[in-house]
């Protein structure tokens, strides 16, 4: 049996990879251990968040599936950091985990060019460092020249609950052990990481009256441009799967509340008294865990001065019969989990439905990858998701999409899609991984991006949909609508930049009615709109041309006006960076004479002999600081 592309693993990375490949015309096979669990949310019942919301909207802009599914499975929608600037705001949705999984599985089953097989991949087949196929536990051999591995925590997964250990990829699911050995046999550098999850509790046993209420936003904002622009069309396709649309096809989800409680000194004492039974401290766990999502025992150990920690109580489904306790990830023994949980306000009589646990798993050092997510050593082998050292559904989905796109582009003999750091958070994510590597689970933050004002959630669709359209994942009619809206926004911005208001009596009265500050000299409308007291809806009162602008378009215009000069500064920085990267490296340059470069970087530059600074920047381990040093030296060298 032969396929153009084979994907191993049906999690968030695998879904995006196989959908992108199949939709781009490649005959695709998804091999997954348990078909019913395609799209399962292994940990928290939420999509998005700070920087993660950016990733979801970028995935959507490129033609991925995560945003659409989130809109139809969402049961609470919130914008985080709303009081801060638009660059760091993040969209987050609680999801019905069952609805999300069922929706994703149905999408895959109804996608042309895509087959699904429930098997365990055991061996990667190669010939002369070229992928030739994959073998499964059933003895089946599937031939392909392009293989995408998206195994998540299943790669040699080992679960810990106290001193108890269990080989598994998730509770109740087989791990992928032989595949890990097959990767090692290919000579790939590998390591061991760890993550964890919290107890899930029966809603009937929670005292909600003792908890703080956390509602969603009054107005829910969808993740996908398809939900915003083409809701009627999508609602017809998914009418039996989602209740998030009203009778007119408008996005109007019923939002279910979350709750907040806190640990206390008694909780901490119980956990401290059982440190000697915690696999995290006894040496039982060897993998490195996520710095920014530590277990409760790790938090109490590292932050001994804290007298309490937040616990976010989140429904797992629309029925809200079971709750996820965000903040209580643990690998402590079951009896200790019960004891410390009963010390938390509102959970004195709580019954655990599913215990918390830690899981260790193998990963491949991401410096083994090209920016296309193809491995350097094996042609046609792509890796995406937690196997590359990341943590999070959104980070995984972003990598899966890029791997699927690039495998399909390779079939078409086209150059891979490589997003720059100034173009997308996806570009930042992949560049960080392949150039710097990681020794701990990597998660995305807005602080990782140098050009945050250019990479906002609200402009993701305008930044990246051109790529999605070019490769065939964004349909013509979708791109036409996106282009129309982009042109409409630019038209509005140009009007505000080019039209001046004079400080006469009539205009001053108009400014007062708009709540804007008075002016004493001729001023562009852009500066007026960019004032701190101006709101998006007031733009409609400036000129009749704005009457038909949508709320989203006005909001985008407001942001561009408020941060206009800072945005221009970042655009200038990007232009300078592009010019710098185009700088040619003289062939006679002796890298060993450049002070400030490490021996490792000098060795790599000598090995690959890059013709330009851009080519040098693509070499794994060559840092931005090294590129700056090279640039300065080249200018001095040419001036001699």
UniProtKB/Swiss-Prot annotation:
Keywords: Cytoplasm, FAD, Flavoprotein, NAD, tRNA processing. Its cofactor is FAD. One of its GO terms (molecular function) is flavin adenine dinucleotide binding. FAD binds at residues 9-14. It comes from the Bacteria. It is found in: Cytoplasm. One of its GO terms (biological process) is tRNA methylation. The keyword rRNA processing does not apply. Pfam families: GIDA (PF01134), GIDA_C_1st (PF21680), SAM_GIDA_C (PF13932). NAD(+) binds at residues 289-303. Its main location: cytoplasm. GO terms for cellular component: cytosol. Belongs to the MnmG family. HAMAP family: MnmG_GidA. NCBIfam families: mnmG_gidA. Homodimer. Heterotetramer of two MnmE and two MnmG subunits. NAD-binding protein involved in the addition of a carboxymethylaminomethyl (cmnm) group at the wobble position (U34) of certain tRNAs, forming tRNA-cmnm(5)s(2)U34. This is tRNA uridine 5-carboxymethylaminomethyl modification enzyme MnmG.
């Amino acid at each position: 049996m032969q396929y153009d592309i084979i994907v191993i693993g049906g999690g968030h990375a695998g879904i995006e990879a196989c959908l992108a490949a199949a939709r781009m015309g490649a005959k695709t096979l998804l091999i997954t251990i348990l078909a019913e669990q395609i799209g399962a949310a292994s940990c928290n019942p939420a999509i998005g968040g700070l920087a993660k919301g950016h990733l979801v909207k970028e995935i959507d802009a490129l033609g991925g599936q995560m945003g659409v599914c989130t809109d139809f499975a969402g049961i609470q929608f919130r914008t985080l950091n709303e009081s801060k600037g638009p660059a760091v705001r993040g969209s987050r949705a609680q999801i019905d985990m069952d609805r999300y999984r069922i929706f994703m599985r149905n999408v895959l089953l109804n996608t042309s060019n895509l087959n699904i097989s429930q098997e365990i991949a055991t061996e990667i087949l190669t010939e002369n460092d070229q992928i030739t196929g994959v073998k499964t536990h059933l003895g089946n051999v599937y031939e392909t020249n392009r293989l995408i591995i998206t195994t998540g925590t299943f790669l040699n997964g080992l679960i810990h609950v106290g001193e108890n250990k269990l080989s598994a990829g998730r509770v109740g699911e087989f791990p992928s052990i032989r595949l890990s050995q097959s990767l090692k046999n290919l000579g790939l550098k590998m390591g061991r990481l760890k993550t964890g999850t919290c107890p899930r509790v029966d809603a009937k046993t929670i005292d909600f009256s003792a908890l703080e209420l956390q509602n969603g936003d009054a107005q829910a904002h969808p993740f996908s441009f398809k939900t915003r622009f083409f809701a009627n069309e999508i609602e017809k396709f998914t009418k039996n799967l989602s209740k998030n649309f009203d009778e007119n096809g408008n996005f109007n989800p019923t939002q279910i509340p979350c709750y907040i409680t806190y640990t206390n000194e008694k909780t901490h004492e119980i956990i401290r008294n059982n440190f000697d039974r915690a696999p995290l401290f006894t040496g039982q766990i060897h993998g490195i865990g996520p710095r920014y999502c530590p277990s409760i025992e790790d938090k109490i150990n590292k932050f001994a001065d804290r007298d309490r920690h937040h616990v976010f109580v989140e429904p797992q489904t629309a029925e809200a019969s079971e709750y996820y306790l965000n903040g209580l990830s643990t690998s402590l023994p079951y009896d200790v989990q019960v004891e410390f949980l009963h010390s938390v306000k509102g959970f004195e009589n709580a019954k655990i439905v599913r215990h918390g646990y830690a899981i260790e798993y193998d990963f491949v050092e991401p410096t083994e990858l090209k920016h296309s997510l193809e491995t350097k050593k094996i042609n046609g082998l792509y890796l995406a998701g937690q196997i590359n050292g990341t943590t999070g559904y959104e980070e995984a989905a972003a990598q899966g999409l890029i791997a699927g796109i690039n495998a399909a582009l390779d079939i078409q003999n086209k150059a891979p899609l490589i997003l720059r750091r100034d173009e997308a958070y996806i570009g930042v994510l992949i560049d960080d991984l392949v150039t710097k590597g990681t020794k701990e689970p990597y998660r995305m933050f807005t602080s990782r991006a140098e050009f945050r004002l250019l990479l906002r959630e609200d402009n993701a669709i305008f930044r990246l949909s051109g790529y999605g359209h070019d490769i065939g994942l964004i349909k013509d009619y979708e791109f036409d609508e996106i282009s129309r809206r982009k042109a409409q926004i630019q038209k509005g911005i140009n009007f505000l930049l080019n039209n001046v208001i004079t400080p006469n009596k009539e205009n001053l009265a108009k400014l007062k009615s708009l709540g804007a500050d008075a002016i004493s000299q001729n001023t562009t409308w852009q500066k007026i709109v960019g004032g701190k007291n101006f709101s998006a809806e007031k733009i409609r009162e400036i000129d009749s041309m704005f009457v038909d602008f949508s709320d989203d378009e006005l909001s985008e215009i407001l942001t561009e006006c408020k941060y206009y000069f800072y945005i221009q500064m970042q655009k200038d920085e990007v232009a300078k960076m592009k010019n710098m990267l185009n700088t040619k490296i003289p062939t006679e340059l002796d890298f060993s004479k450049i002070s400030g470069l490490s021996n490792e970087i000098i060795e790599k530059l000598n090995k690959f002999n890059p013709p330009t600074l851009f080519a040098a920047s693509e070499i794994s381990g060559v840092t931005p600081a090294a590129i700056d040093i090279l640039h300065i030296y080249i200018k001095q060298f040419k001036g001699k």
